[in-house]
Amino acid sequence: MEQNTIRSNRWNEAARYGLIFGGISSAYIYLGRLMVALELTGTFGSILSFVLWTAKFIGCIKLMQYAMRKFSQDNPSAVRSDIFRLGRNIAVLSALVFSTFAVADIMYISTEYYQAAYTTIITEISKTLPAQNVEEMKNMLVDLPKYTFIGNFIYCSLYGIVLSFILSRNIPSQNPFINNTEEQ
């Protein structure tokens, strides 16, 4: 019964934090676009972009660590494998949220932005490639949302799972008499 409670708590927490992480990553897309719209380019824009990326990167690591520690404190009988599974669930759910948003952004929200960027790329590349290759690249635009979803989902999930593995090793359960290496 206690393991079912831990599993239920784990999914509830993962859903909440998955939405938060996915929201942070989705908002970061628009911060980059806002910088372009405000013409924050050049050295200052690059530095600001790096600072924002660093803040997002470190902030997400700290937030993941906080979520895992809080779960450990709220569920004293949770072992390290439970804490890792929480992180894994957060990673997969946030990857799902972010990937879905990225596809919606490409297909519905910022269609003109992506169309203009893709047209610019095709125009520049067409100067060096044969016409047949250029036509094949134009046909890839139809599949861009699919590739974006799959690529983002795999990358974000793997990154989050590795991060969860690393962080869960440093978050012991509250009960020193529980064998933390045991899989339940």
Over which residues does each language-model region extend?
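Transmembrane alpha-helical insertion/packing segments
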Residues: M1-A67
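Short, charged juxtamembrane terminal tails flanking transmembrane helices
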Residues: M1-I6, I171-Q184
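Alpha-helical transmembrane spans of integral membrane proteins, capturing the lipid-embedded, hydrophobic core
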Residues: A14, G18-S26, W53-I58, G87, ...
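Transmembrane alpha-helical segments in integral membrane proteins
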Residues: L63, P145-P176
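Membrane-helix interface/capping segments
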Residues: L63-D82
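Short amphipathic alpha-helical coupling elements at transmembrane boundaries
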Residues: V79-L86, T123
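Functional transmembrane-helix hotspots
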Residues: T100-K127
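Short membrane-interface loop/juxtamembrane segments of multi-pass integral membrane proteins
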Residues: T123-P145
